[in-house]
From Swiss-Prot:
It comes from Acinetobacter baumannii (strain SDF). InterPro entries: L-lactate/malate_DH (IPR001557), Lactate/malate_DH_C (IPR022383), Lactate/malate_DH_N (IPR001236), Lactate_DH/Glyco_Ohase_4_C (IPR015955), Malate_DH_type2 (IPR010945), NAD(P)-bd_dom_sf (IPR036291). This is Malate dehydrogenase. Keywords: NAD, Oxidoreductase, Tricarboxylic acid cycle. Coiled coil: none annotated.
């Protein structure tokens, strides 16, 4: 059996946390031979801390062979101590009458604090995934607040958009999700994201040719994927928690264990690829190997794609401007 690794999860007693923790403890994220120590953070409010205790009781009651230990805390420095993986799930949701700029600032404070704590106490190789929205900008803030950690250690979750897009394309083309390769999502985790199946194949056959419906792409597919979160809230009365947790597991598993040459989507700090300014936390097609991701290079960006990529980039630049005074 391998040595246990430390997995920190914030917002651990929330809806996504509840869908996530049992799957991490069962080995779905890091493999069936990798013991884990869960380091769980919740806000310093009695109700949240009580809820966290209850979740930890349930984790105990599963008797997971891979769960080598557990701590619950309201202190980021305790939660992130020597963490090998950190899933930053907790964030402040948008309240009634709250402007997006206010939301960015409120979350900015949270992610500055968490970035600083990671900088101080986490493993120098910590892999950080930001799930809490606005995910790209929160990840950017955490990254900027942790100057002693490599920027590449910080990522944002675009995998939910990616998975949503996979299913829509599979249903339209009459193929199964497992056969689809080379789909990606560019940009921000928001309705401006650009899901792109121009290079996608199913069993080697081009999906763009198979679907061959530009109007569907523009008027049905992109809005459906972009607004899926809102559609789920409307249907369920609650936000998508299980599918978000599933996407977080997918993102971390692929980053840690590799994709065998398959493309996945990750929000990563840009290295200047495809004209995206360096440092912007942006969804790209990537492949992963030995715990490192690489942006897929050399893809042709046609006029429609450039428009959509610029549209989502502009939103990210606006978000970055709104919190510019908060980060160096």
């Amino acid at each position: 059996m391998k040595q246990p690794v430390r997995v920190a999860v914030t917002g651990a007693a929330g809806q996504i946390g509840y869908s996530l923790l049992f799957r991490i403890a069962s080995g779905e994220m890091l493999g069936k031979d990798q013991p884990v120590i869960l380091q769980l953070l919740e806000v310093p409010v009695e109700k949240a801390q009580q809820a966290l205790k209850g979740v930890m009781m349930e984790l105990d009651d599963c008797a997971f062979p891979l769960l080598a230990g557990m701590i619950g805390t309201d202190d980021p420095k305790v939660a992130f101590k020597d963490a090998d993986y950190a899933l930053l799930v907790g964030s402040r949701p948008r309240g009634p009458g709250m402007e997006r700029a206010d939301l960015l600032k409120v979350n900015g404070e949270i992610f500055i604090g968490q970035g600083q704590a990671l900088n101080e106490v986490a493993s120098r190789d910590v892999k950080v995934l930001v799930v809490g929205n606005p995910a790209n900008t929160n990840a950017y803030i955490a990254m900027k607040s942790a100057p002693d950690l490599p920027a590449k250690n910080f990522t944002a979750m675009l995998r939910l958009d990616h998975n949503r897009a996979l299913t829509q394309v599979a249903q339209k083309a009459g193929v199964v999700v497992a056969d689809i390769e080379k789909l990606t999502v560019w940009g921000n985790h928001s309705p401006t994201m650009y899901a792109d199946y121009r290079f996608a194949t199913a069993n080697g056959e081009s999906l763009k040719d198979k679907i061959n419906d530009p109007a569907w792409n523009k008027d049905v597919f992109l809005p459906t994927v972009g607004k899926r979160g809102a559609a789920i809230i409307e249907a369920r009365g609650l936000s998508s928690a299980a599918s978000a947790a599933n996407a977080a597991i997918d993102h971390m598993r692929d980053w840690a264990l590799g994709t065998n040459g398959k493309w996945v989507t990750m929000g990563v700090p840009s290295d200047g690829s495809y004209g995206i300014p360096e440092g912007v936390m942006f969804g790209f097609p990537v492949t992963t190997e030995n715990g490192e991701y690489k942006i897929v290079q050399g893809l042709e960006i046609d006029e429609f794609s450039r428009e959509r990529i610029n549209f989502t980039l502009n939103e990210l630049e606006e978000e970055r401007a709104a919190i510019a005074d908060m980060v160096k």
